[in-house]
């Protein structure tokens, strides 16, 4: 389904402008070593605006296909890419960036609350005091166990992307359903996975316990954006 997700996001240049607005509202610009890491970078809708702001960007994702779209969309980019799991201790070595961001709902794709807590701990150990951390995610704590929600994410004459949420105790079971019209009729493909339910207050407390101080927060189209400073 990786090739479907970039289409699902819509006009990526518009998405990049949206992310740039978030960064500017948080007064993000190079101040230290000028290095930014984009965790769960996907096709680069955060990485490209960060480069435009003057950062040297390392885009990290599990999907090599999605990362390859960065160069395809911006042939002259100097963004470096790396296929890696953001939970891996081996990833966090060498000189730490002045800015670490994990957006696009990446943190909710972690396997468990322990994975989330362990990952924040890795960030805290890796980053230097004064470094910035930006998180962007959807707080799914509005759903109660047993609740179900289904909605169309994007549709065109020949393509429909639908998402179904089934809420359990600490997770939401997500099924992405993609309909595409071909010469032979409609085809259907789907992918199911879990998303962590991370209530905003709990997330902030976990960050605080790991020496991250909340500096600013914002919300746009249901996505929460949080800026932390490493103490």
What are these language model-derived features?
Residues 44-89:
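Class I SAM-dependent methyltransferase SAM/SAH-binding core
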Residues 210-212, 219-231:
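Core SAM-dependent methyltransferase catalytic element
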Residues 1-31, 33-42:
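Conserved class I S-adenosyl-L-methionine
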């Amino acid at each position: 389904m990786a090739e479907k997700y970039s289409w699902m996001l819509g006009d990526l240049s518009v998405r990049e402008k949206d992310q740039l607005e978030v960064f500017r509202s948080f007064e993000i610009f190079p101040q230290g070593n000028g290095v930014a890491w984009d965790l769960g970078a996907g096709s680069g809708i955060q990485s490209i605006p960060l480069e435009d702001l003057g950062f040297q960007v390392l885009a990290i994702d599990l999907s090599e296909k999605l990362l390859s779209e960065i160069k395809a969309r911006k042939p002259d980019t100097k963004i470096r890419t790396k296929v890696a799991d953001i939970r891996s201790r081996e990833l966090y070595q060498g000189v730490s960036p002045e800015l670490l961001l994990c957006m696009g709902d990446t943190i909710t794709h972690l396997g468990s609350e322990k994975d989330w807590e362990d990952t924040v701990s890795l960030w805290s150990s890796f980053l230097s005091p004064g470094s910035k951390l930006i998180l962007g995610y959807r707080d799914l704590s509005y759903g109660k166990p047993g609740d179900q929600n289904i909605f169309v994410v994007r549709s065109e004459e020949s393509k429909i992307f639908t998402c179904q949420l089934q809420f359990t105790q600490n997770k939401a079971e997500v099924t992405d359903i993609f309909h595409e019209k071909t010469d032979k009729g409609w085809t259907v493909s789907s992918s199911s996975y879990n998303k962590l339910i991370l209530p905003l207050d709990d997330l902030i407390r976990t960050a605080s316990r790991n020496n991250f101080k909340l500096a600013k927060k914002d919300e746009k189209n249901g996505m929460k954006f949080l800026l932390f400073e490493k103490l």
